[in-house]
Every structure is written in C-alpha cells, then in structure tokens.
C-alpha cells in the first residue's frame, strides 16, 4: 500500500468530508442503525447495521526500533481478538501490521469507528519515544513558565533517562512536601483492560509511595451522581430493562439524551445490546418523544416527536408540567403520600407561594421557548399513558445541572408511575447499553490500586484529601482556597507534582485556556499516553504507552449488562518504543525501590490469569461453571446467560411493593422531593427542593457581542477526544475543523454559507469551525461537538484554537456548591466568517524536537 501523509489525505478528502457534514449533519439513521451492506461470514449482519468503509487505511511514516522482530509477533499474518471502548474486534494482521478490524460476530451494532481503531497504532500523533521538554531538561522546574508553549521543543531520551527523571520528581515531591502535594487522581477514559488500565496502574504506584490527593465523581455525571443519592438513594440506579420498556411502555421520552450516539461506547467494552432494543421499540411502533434543543440522531432514527427547549431550561418545563397536573387535579396523591417526602414544600414553590411566581406553562414558555399549549398537552399525554423517561447526562453538564434530574424525579412522582412496569425514569439508557438485563457473569477485578504505603510518610498532610473532580484548574491556581462542597468545607492543597495517564483534561475540562495557565504552576508534570494530546504537550516528561493491539489483557463485556469476558490478545509488537502501562509503572516502581511491592512478582500474563481465575472461583460459588483459563484464552471470549428474572427487572418495584421492607437509602427512606439536609446547607444555588435557576450564560443572557448560546454534544466519530488523531475525524470535519451547527436564520443574518470556515468566540476563547447550516438546531443556539483536540495558535486575531475544541469556549464554574460538577454547554458566543488564510492544524503532528 502506498504511503499517504495526513496532509495529502486531508486535501484529497476535504471536499467529500465537507459535503457529507453539510448534507447530512445527523444522518445516524443511515450510518449507524441500518444495514446497507452485509459483511461475508458475519452471522449477525441482518440484525446489525455494520458499515465497513471502502476507503483504504492511511499509512504513516513507521520507524520501528531494532527490537521489532516479525518472527516474535504472535500474528505476523492472521486474525486475533481484542477489545476497545467501541466494542470487541478481530484485528487483521498482514506482515506484522494491522490492516483492518473485523467486528465481533455477536455484536448487535458494530461501531462506525472500526477504521479509526485500526489506524490508532500508526497515528501521526503517536508518542514514539520517551520525551522530555528541552527547557525542563536544562532547568528543571524553573522552566515551568514555558510549559505548553506552542514552540517549546522536545528531546528524545532513553527509557532509563526518562524513568530516572520521573522517579526523581516523584521522590523529591514526597520527600519535600508529602502526598498532599501530588495531584495523581487523574481522570480519563484511558484504554480498556483490567491490567493495562492507566488509572489504576498509576494509583497503585502513588499509593505505595504514600498516597495522593483523590477526586470524587466524574466529568460525565458529577451532578446527578451527587443529587440522586439524596433523592432516590443512588447516584446511578439500575434501570428497568429494555425488555419491559418494549412490552409495557406506551410512551418513551428521550430527555436530553442521544443513545444511538453515546451507546457506541462502554466503560469496559460492548456488544451494543441497545441497538437490538431500539430496533424492537421502533418495530413495535411505540411513540417516542425527544426533548432537546437539538434534533438528535436517536430522534431521527426513531421518528420521534421533537420538543425543543432552550438549553438549561428543562427544569422550568418540568415544573410547569407539574403545575398543570396539579391545577387539573391529575396528580397521583396516593403515590405522593406513600412514597415521597416533601410534596408540600415543593408544591409551595410550584404554585408560587414560596417566591410569588406561579410555575405555569406560560411562565415556562417565556423561559424555554416551548409553547404553553405544548407543555400542557405533553403533561397530560405522559399522565394518560405509561411513560418511561430516559434522561441523559448532557442535561446535567450545564449550569445548575443538579436540578433537571431532581425535577424529573418530582414529575415522575406526581405521575405516580415509578416502580410500575414501563413507567418512571432511568438515568443510564444512553450509557453503556443501560437497561440491558444483567447476565449471570461473576465480577472480574482489576489490578488493585488501594494498597498501603511501603515507605514512610514524613511530611504532614496539608489541605483536603479529596477534591471535586472538576476542581483541577481552580485548585492548581489557588492553593489554600476553601470551598463549599456537598455540605462540607474543602481546602485546596498546594500541588508540586501532576501525573496524568490515559486522559486528556485539555479536552474534557472547561475554559481550556485557563487550564493551560494552571498547568504552568506545578514543579513537574508527567504524562503517560499513546498520542500527543494537548495534555502531553503541556507536560515535562512524556512516557509512550501501547495501544490495546500491542499487549495482552482481559476485560468484562458490558458495564450495565456484564455479558461476559473477552481476551485481549496482543496482535502486533509495541510500535516504536512504546510499552504497556503496567510495564511503565513497574519500571517506575523499580526506580523508586518498590518494584516487588508493585508487581508482587507477577508478569502481565500472571495477573491476567489471576483475574480470570478469581472470577472463575466467584462464579463457582454462585453456581456458574466456567472453563479453565487456557480454554477461555484459546476461544477468546465467554458469554453468560440472562435469567428471566433479570430480563423482567423493574426499577424501584420492590420499594413500591413494600416501602417499609425496602426503603430507599435517603433521609426518609422515600423519594425526597424536599431534602432537609440540603436545605440545611443554606446554598443559594441548590435549595432544599428542585428549582429552576437561569443559567449564567445561555439564551436569556444573550448580548450584542455574544448573542448565541453554545451546546457541546457528543460526536459519533470519537469518544471524547479519542480517535480524533485518526482518519475517522475526516468523516465529520470541514477542512480539518470541527463543524459548527447553526440554524439557517442565524447563518443568513451573518452571511454564512455551508462549508465556510468561521470564528466562534466567547468571553474565554475562540476557535475555528466549519459551518453546517441545519434546522436541527433551534435559532439562537449553535452546536460544536465535544472532543476536538485543543490546538491554540497565535494569529492576527489573537490566540485561536484552530482545530475547534468546544471547551475552549465554555465557562469554568461549578454546577452548584452541592455537586461542583463541570459545565460543557454553558457559554454565550458569536459566530463570524473567518477572513484571510486559514491557519494549519498542527496538533496531529509530532511536536517541535531538538536532536541531541
């Protein structure tokens, strides 16, 4: 196959990609959920909608180390099996090189991203060697001011040198400042696997050293995971199964979620169970309703009715629905009396006794843009039909994000359908095939990270031991600051060392320019990763990790369904000088004098065998017979049956049947429509009952300078920022820029046409994006999909992120003092035509390098 450079590929495909992005910005129903082409030898083809791109995989300039030997490869030629967040794949290897990926034969909906997965080992952005920032190599921590600068040069060093430098920085930090100076509780989706998962590998090392400052919650779901334990006793309650929904639900409401897109991935790996259920729901003809400022890919596929409130105004719509049902005497008083606490307090707010404002549909119309008549009819429709509300997480990654889920729980309580087959709500139907019935598979553990220190801790702890997950910028910039958090006071420590592995905060954290300033504060930043993300470019020491194709591992199948186990078999040699995460941290442990404690004398295969055998023993205790490890490894996977009891699971059914015998883990044992505990915190941004708060930035706060509101939806072509450095992105970008979806009315007012390169600007930063004019986004709102790599460059217009990372624009403030979750869709912006030459995207190239 001929060599194809990234620039050549972009040039050749720019027109095609732009046309595709413009013509069909959400054509998921054609691409993700239908079956235009069957794949020979693929038995599930008629039931799944696999697409197998015809275009060849681009080849990068591949320079291998002398240790690479095709004779050593397990698969010089052939097929294997491994797993990624996008699913189980069978890599096809020719001449020691992956040339493609075949889907797993039991996958209901193979990912559209198989091409990008296959290309990942050869990405132009691959971290090829251990690298150290030149200024750091010369001046150490004194060089922090230039960390992350666009023209900062890097030096290739040996593994031994890189590990020595990293070990010295770690040792010095613990010796001089103690574990409270170590920000090691990284966040990110890393690679799947029970052994070479970067986060537990790093946590194990740092805990053996004495500990580190931890984090609570996730960027995905911090608000709901904090508020829902107060409301229903669990941050992520198990959902009623899809089997029950299909059988018993008369209406399904997709509120702020897009399961066709977001179920493409799984925290472990997936066989995409959700797809079969969506097909069955559509085939049955159940009416679905999508409540979202964007007409989602799911709504397109299902033919859903589309109700489109302004971003962040969903609690107002829900409150107005409650008002309407109360005013027409349609509330379920018996349910409220028996199963909830605090209806009287909430009702005072709804009817205006608390603040003098009645939460009528007319009130909500002025806020949300949804006509009052539609709010009324919607309220009565869901009251008159058994309705399952499927609420997403994007709706809580917005200012005051706790309120949407809490208000929906209140609405469902007023309807009285919680605990009934096909009724109530679920918070994870959009994630990891949530709602799939649990199999009988036992749990499989991973490399233990909660281990005791093996060296003395000589410095006293300063500050709090656990921080909110999204406090990283604030904490780095303001050591010693005291904040309110979930009823407690938290004090930021002073960080001297930041270690990040398998994650990219320069995409998932809001106000990216401010994060870049914060990353200049620590003495040392160490990053372990596969590719040159912006996070790696803001480090001092960078250690190259392997992709899942380049090592052995094992993992569960299905976070929600626990379908079974899959062997992750090495398909190719580690490329360049990359190493498996476990080997990297074992080598670091060796330099720190704690290798035996870290490895326990086990090789990678020893650990993998242990994980399986421990699960096998657990299965035996549960009456599940599993084959021995060698038999399992040879076959490559193991799937478990699902019982009828699990297939017919109804959320909160036990609680409804007997609330005294099965109380919720809340203050009252019931659903909390009012929480005395939260009220007792006296927060002005999260009261004792669900409330509508106007977002700090949104449609209601439009100004002449920034008249539009931003939404940052998930992209079907990557997972957060993963795969953005492969050719997959070219299927959804315009001249290598992230598309900006804009309503025809807003585009016309600005003289913008399809495919134009535009400047999108907020109070915090500016990005370049390619215009996609579509009526699938409401007027006054734009969409820039989340996950484009941060690529700031100096231009005549100032510093511009020329690739188009949505978080460059977003406000960095907590959702509230309760959850302190991150925002992703809170920003006022303006979109204008870019004038002059378009700056080149450079973030997928190797960084500037000094040859020594």
Model-derived regions, located:
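Acidic/polar loop patches that form or flank catalytic/metal-binding clefts of enzymes
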Residues: 214-215, 331-334, 374-376, 388-389, ...
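N-terminal export/assembly segments and adjacent metallocofactor-ligating motifs
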Residues: 2-330, 371, 748, 792-852
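Flexible glycine/proline-rich, aromatic-decorated loop/lid segments
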Residues: 297, 533-567
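Long, contiguous, secondary-structure-rich segments that constitute the structural scaffold
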Residues: 581-635, 721, 727-741, 745-852
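N-terminal leader/propeptide and maturation segments of large enzyme subunits in energy/redox metabolism
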Residues: 136-161, 330-370, 456, 571-660, ...
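Active-site phosphate/pyrophosphate-binding segments
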Residues: 321, 342-471
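Short beta-alpha connecting loops at secondary-structure transitions
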Residues: 303-308, 563-574
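Extended redox/cofactor-interaction regions of prokaryotic respiratory oxidoreductases
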Residues: 197-280, 284-291, 315-319, 413-537, ...
